[in-house]
């Protein structure tokens, strides 16, 4: 009798627990607060909305419901690591840290825990070497790709040669902003252009000294690795010194409406790289509406 009770108890527990075990857990390490909130909110909303769509339209993935576990990082590396530690035990399938600094810290942890990291267009560029970093995936592009593409565009604008030209890199003074430096230094040596490095401290509202230096040195091109308010301030400062906007090129994290609208018409001509098609003229948006 005791054996039968044990079997029935175990079966009852299994049926009670199995729906929970069947959930597909996707952690959302988002930042809706802090100085980068205006950039973090749209991504966090879109991430959650897409999984809501999959649940309501398709019944989840492969018949399994999706659960999004939210954790606020405020774009702070320490908080990001705390979010990882507090959510990985929920059966998290993949992490998107949304921060190069957080990504660097999570790479060894995720490898030890066998949990993939998807850092689309950010994070540790060398992580694309799958022989070394088996749990990191950073498609569709890296910051080394971006540095090369921006340089190629500047070269095309200069008639095929950058020899004797000056390029200034205005960058967020963080792991993210420093990612393209070694690539640009190598390209500078290869193509014989002069590279100047102008770091901007977090959050990026104060840039007077950097733009005074730009005004003094008169670079032919400016590349920007910015984020948040830093972008709009830089574009406005470029307009203030009448820098030719067509020669001002931002990475893909420096090309949203939030970045250009504050400068108004003065932003016309400014360019940024892109790793996705803009707009909402795609079938998935019809389903979400």
Protein language model features and the residues they cover:
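Signal peptide-proximal N-terminal region
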Residues: 45-68, 160-162, 189-192
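Sec/Tat signal peptide C-region and signal peptidase I cleavage site
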Residues: 17-22
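Bacterial N-terminal signal peptides that target proteins for export
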Residues: 1-10
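Short, well-ordered beta-strand elements
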Residues: 23-31, 66-70, 165-169
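Extracellular/periplasmic Venus flytrap/periplasmic-binding protein
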Residues: 125-126, 134-241, 279-287
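Extracellular/periplasmic periplasmic-binding protein-like sensory domains
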Residues: 238-289
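Periplasmic-binding protein-like
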Residues: 87-100, 118-120, 166-171, 197, ...
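Beta-alpha junction/loop-to-helix N-cap segments that form part of ligand/metal-binding clefts
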Residues: 25, 38-45, 57-129, 139, ...
């Amino acid at each position: 009798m005791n054996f039968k009770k044990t079997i029935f108890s175990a079966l009852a527990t299994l049926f009670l627990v199995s729906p929970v075990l069947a959930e597909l857990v996707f952690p959302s390490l988002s930042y809706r607060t802090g100085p980068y909130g205006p950039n973090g909110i749209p991504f966090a909303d879109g991430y959650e909305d897409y999984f809501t769509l999959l649940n309501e339209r398709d019944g989840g993935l492969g018949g399994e419901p999706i659960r999004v576990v939210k954790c606020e990082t405020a774009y702070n590396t320490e908080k990001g690591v705390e979010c990882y530690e507090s959510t990985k035990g929920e059966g998290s399938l993949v992490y998107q840290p949304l921060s190069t600094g957080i990504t660097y810290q999570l790479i060894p942890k995720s490898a030890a825990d066998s949990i993939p990291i998807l850092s689309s267009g950010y994070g540790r560029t060398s992580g694309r070497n799958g022989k070394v970093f088996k749990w990191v995936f950073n498609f569709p592009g890296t910051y080394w790709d971006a540095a090369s593409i921006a340089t190629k565009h500047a070269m095309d604008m200069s008639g095929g040669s950058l020899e004797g030209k000056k390029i200034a890199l205005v960058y967020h003074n963080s792991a993210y902003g420093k990612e393209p430096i070694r690539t640009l230094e190598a390209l500078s040596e290869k193509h014989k252009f002069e590279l100047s490095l102008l770091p901007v401290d977090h959050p990026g509202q104060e840039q007077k000294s950097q733009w005074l230096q730009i005004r003094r040195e008169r670079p032919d091109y400016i590349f920007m690795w910015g984020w948040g308010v830093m972008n709009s301030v830089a574009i406005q400062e470029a307009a203030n010194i009448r820098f030719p906007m067509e020669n001002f090129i931002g990475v893909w994290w420096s090309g949203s409406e939030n970045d250009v609208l504050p400068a108004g018409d003065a932003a016309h001509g400014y360019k940024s790289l892109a790793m996705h098609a803009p707009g909402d003229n795609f079938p998935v948006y019809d389903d979400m509406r």
